[in-house]
Amino acid sequence: MRNSQTSPDHYKRFEIEPFDFIHANGLGFAEGNVIKYVCRWREKDGIEDLEKAVRYLELLIVYAKIEKEKNET
């Protein structure tokens, strides 16, 4: 059952809530946070949410580069 804690107003405008999309597609923590913050920035914390999304994208890039280097050696 969804309530204001599990289904906040800033996600109700979407056909599928970010959590459901993230879960259905098996996305990881950082990827999920990018989606969460990008989806809610207009309705919740504005630029702060976009900055958080960027931070998680930067982390994904760092870890992707580490994985690439591991696979190349």
Outline where the language-model segments fall:
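Intrinsically disordered, low-complexity regulatory regions
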Residues: M1-T73
